[in-house]
Design a protein with these regions (language model features):
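A short helix/loop element that forms part of the nucleotide-sugar donor recognition site in Leloir-type
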Residues: 28, 111, 216-232, 285-288
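Conserved acidic donor-binding segment of nucleotide-sugar-dependent glycosyltransferases
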Residues: 353-354, 358-365, 374-380
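A short, well-ordered alpha-helix in the C-terminal region of glycosyltransferases
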Residues: 139, 374, 381-396, 402-408
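Short hydrophobic beta-strand element within catalytic cores of glycosyltransferases
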Residues: 329, 338-341, 351
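Aromatic "clamp/platform" in nucleotide-sugar-dependent glycosyltransferases that forms part
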Residues: 302, 321
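Nucleotide-activated donor-binding/catalytic signature segment of Leloir-type glycosyltransferases, i.e.
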Residues: 284-301
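A conserved mid-protein helix/loop that constitutes part of the nucleotide-sugar donor-binding site
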Residues: 53-61, 237, 241-260, 366
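Donor nucleotide-sugar binding/catalytic pocket of nucleotide-sugar-dependent glycosyltransferases
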Residues: 92-93, 172-224
Length: 436
C-alpha cells in the first residue's frame, strides 16, 4: 500500500484545547523553577512538540501529587505554558525540530544539557523521537541517576530506505543512553525487541500497558445530544473516527471503505472527529477536498472534549498503520462503543478480538468495510461488544490505577539509585533498575 508524506504543525485547535483542559484538570500556578531546597525528588519530563501535551493530561499532576517536583520541557508554545499551569508543574521551552536537522539538533542538545546540569534532577522521562533522543543523551552526559525513555510508538515502522535506518539508529541511541525504556503496549515492546532497539531486559511494560489509562467517569455511556448539531438524523447509523487525519492513521483506506459501506448501507454517515495535521504523513489536497465535500462525511475539526462525540457513534474505526497504544480505542470502549481497528503494532493490544471489537489487517479498505458492515447489521452484537468493552476497561485501564503503577515504579527506581545502587553507566542501565 502506498504511504504519503509532508511536515508542519497545526495550531487552530489551541483555544478549544485550553478550554477543555481547564475543565478537566486541577488548576495551579506554574513554577518558574523548581526549588532546589525541597527534599522532593525532581523529575524532568520532555516531549518534542507542545501538541503532545494532549497525551500528558493527568500524568504530570499525578506525579506532583505523589511528591515529585516536575518540570515539563518542550518546544515553545502556549500549550506548554498552559499545560504546566493546569497540571501545577514547572515548564521550560527549548526549541526542538521534528524533522532531521543536524545543526538545530546540536543546539537543542546543548540547551537540554545546560538545563539538566542546572536543575540536577533525580530522574528524567523523555518521549517522542527527537526529545527522546536528545533528552537521553543530555541526561547521560549530566549523569542523571534514573533516565527513562518512554516509547510511545515507532515511527520507523512506516518509513523506508535511509530515513528508516536513521530513525532506527536514533531509537537505538536513545535506548542506549537510558536506564529503562518504558513501552506502552506489549506488541510495541515485542516489536522493539525484534528490531533490536534495545535488550529485552531494558524494555519494560507496566501492567497491561497504556500511558495514562482512561477517565471512566468522563468517558461513559449516556444520552447523546450532538446529532442535531452535527446535522445527523436521529436514527441513522454512524461510523466514527477520532484522531489526527493523516495517512498513518489510515484515512485514505477509511474513505475508500466508507464508499463501499454506502453501497450497502446508503443511510450511513461517517463522523471524523479530528483535524488535518500537516505532518510528515499529511493527506494530499485531493483527498482533503473529497472529505470536505462529501455529503455523508461530517468533519468536526479539532475537538478538545471528545467524550460526547463517542456517544454519537455506532461503531468506531481506527484503521491505523502503527501505534504505541491508542487512547481513542480505550475511550470508545469505556463509552460502550465497539471498535474496528488493525493488527498493527499497538492497536492490536487495545481490543479483545470478537469480544470488544474486531481486528483487521492494515491497508485493506475491503477489510474495513466488511468489518463495519458486520457490526452495523447486528445491533445486538454491537450492544454485547460495547458492554464487554467497558467492563474490560474497568478491569484494566482505569486512569488512577494505570498512573498509580507509574508512580510506584518511578519511586522504586529512585529508591534503588538514591540508596547507592549503581547510579550511572552500563551496570545501572542493564541490571540495577529492574521493574517491580
Amino acid at each position: 500500500m502506498s504511504r504519503r508524506s509532508g511536515d508542519s504543525t497545526n495550531t487552530t485547535f489551541l483555544p478549544a484545547f485550553l478550554h477543555a483542559r481547564s475543565r478537566f484538570s486541577a488548576s495551579a500556578a506554574p513554577l518558574a523553577e523548581p526549588l532546589r531546597s525541597s527534599p522532593s525528588p525532581h523529575i524532568v519530563v520532555g516531549i518534542t512538540n507542545p501538541q503532545t501535551c494532549m497525551v500528558l493530561g493527568g500524568r504530570l499532576r499525578t506525579l506532583r501529587e505523589a511528591g515529585f517536583r516536575v518540570t515539563l520541557v518542550s518546544s515553545p508554545g502556549e500549550l506548554l505554558t498552559r499545560t504546566a499551569a493546569l497540571e501545577g508543574v514547572g515548564s521550560v521551552a527549548i526549541p526542538m525540530r521534528r524533522e532531521i536537522a543536524p545543526f538545530a539538533d546540536f543546539v537543542s542538545l546543548v540547551r537540554l544539557w545546560r538545563l539538566l546540569h542546572r536543575l540536577k534532577p533525580e530522574m528524567t522521562e523523555f518521549s517522542t523521537p527527537k526529545a527522546g533522543l536528545l533528552g537521553a543523551i543530555a541526561g547521560m552526559l549530566c549523569g542523571v541517576p534514573a533516565r527513562v525513555y518512554f516509547l510511545r510508538g515507532l515511527k520507523l515502522e512506516t518509513c523506508t530506505g535511509v530515513k528508516r535506518r536513521i530513525l532506527w539508529v536514533a531509537e537505538k541511541l536513545a535506548a542506549a543512553c537510558s536506564h529503562v525504556v518504558l513501552c506502552n503496549s506489549d506488541s510495541l515492546r515485542n516489536q522493539a525487541i525484534a528490531l533490536g532497539v534495545a535488550s529485552e531486559s531494558k524494555l519494560r511494560l507496566l501492567g497491561s500497558g497504556s500511558s495514562n489509562g482512561v477517565d471512566v467517569e468522563r468517558f461513559k455511556p449516556g444520552p447523546c445530544g450532538l446529532r442535531e448539531r452535527l446535522g445527523l438524523p436521529p436514527d441513522v447509523p454512524v461510523v466514527g473516527f477520532v484522531g489526527r487525519l493523516t495517512s498513518d492513521k489510515g484515512l485514505p483506506e477509511l474513505i475508500e471503505a466508507f464508499d463501499a459501506i454506502l453501497a450497502v448501507k446508503p443511510e450511513a454517515h461517517l463522523l471524523l472527529v479530528g483535524w488535518f495535521d500537516a505532518a510528515e504523513d499529511a493527506l494530499g489536497n485531493d483527498l482533503r477536498s473529497r472529505i470536505k465535500k462529501h455529503p455523508r462525511i461530517h468533519l468536526t475539526g479539532y475537538v478538545a472534549d471528545t467524550a460526547p462525540y463517542y456517544r454519537v457513534m455506532d461503531v468506531m474505526v481506527l484503521p491505523t498503520w502503527r501505534e504505541g497504544f491508542p487512547n481513542v480505542v480505550l475511550e470508545a470502549a469505556a463509552t460502550g462503543i465497539p471498535v474496528v481497528t488493525t493488527l498493527s503494532t499497538g492497536s492490536r493490544d487495545a481490543v479483545v478480538p470478537e469480544v470488544t471489537g474486531l481486528l483487521i489487517p492494515p491497508g485493506f479498505p475491503v477489510a474495513i468495510s466488511e468489518a463495519v458492515l458486520q457490526l452495523l447489521r447486528n445491533p445486538e452484537r454491537r450492544r454485547r461488544m460495547g458492554e464487554a468493552a467497558r467492563a474490560w476497561v474497568l478491569d484494566n485501564y482505569v486512569n488512577r490505577r494505570v498512573l498509580g503503577r507509574t508512580v510506584h515504579y518511578y519511586q522504586s527506581l529512585l529508591d534503588q539509585n538514591l540508596s547507592g545502587v549503581a547510579t550511572s553507566g552500563p551496570a545501572a542501565r542493564d541490571s540495577a533498575l529492574n521493574p517491580i
